[in-house]
């Protein structure tokens, strides 16, 4: 399984595919997609199972914006064209920025003495559960 986090920006999208100035028409694959394609070919030649490629939108804003909707359409169109799945991603949250420099994740909160989660932390944990479910990894379930 290959998980590719993608910030909600056409700047980052350009690593997957080139797109026209309107953000609507995919004009061709880009460097990262070509790398994954090559890896898939090598695995097939070696008789190995296919790579399950999943693109996850990262740092989503809470507001409804035109660019956000264009990104969603572009990712869905590209997924059909080059063969990856999409999974629910993570919203932009302060908790992620606070935990990262300390080498911690949401699952470490109890271990560092957090007794009661605020509503944002609860929502972030649900996003993590949704992602784990979407990955469909054998023997893995979000039991936290």
Model-derived features with residue positions:
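Cell-surface, membrane-associated systems
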Residues: 89-93
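Conserved catalytic-core segment of NTP-binding enzymes
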Residues: 1-88, 98
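Broad hydrophobic/π-residue packing in well-ordered secondary structure
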Residues: 77, 95-96, 128, 134
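C-terminal alpha-helix
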Residues: 126-142
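A general structural signal for short secondary-structure boundary/capping elements
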Residues: 26, 98-105, 133-137
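C-terminal boundary of histidine-terminating zinc-finger modules
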Residues: 100-122
């Amino acid at each position: 399984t290959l998980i590719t986090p993608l910030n909600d920006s056409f700047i980052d999208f350009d690593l997957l595919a080139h797109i026209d100035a309107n953000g609507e028409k995919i004009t061709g694959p880009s460097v990262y997609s070509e790398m994954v394609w090559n890896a898939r070919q090598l695995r097939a030649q070696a008789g190995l199972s296919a790579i399950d490629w999943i693109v996850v939108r990262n740092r989503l804003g809470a507001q409804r914006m035109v660019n956000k909707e264009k990104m969603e359409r572009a990712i869905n169109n590209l997924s059909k064209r080059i063969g990856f799945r999409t999974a629910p991603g993570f919203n932009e949250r302060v908790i992620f920025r606070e935990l990262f420099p300390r080498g911690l994740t949401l699952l470490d909160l109890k271990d560092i003495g957090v007794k009661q989660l605020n509503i944002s932390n609860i929502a972030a944990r649900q996003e993590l559960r949704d992602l784990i479910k979407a990955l469909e990894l054998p023997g893995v379930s979000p039991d936290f």
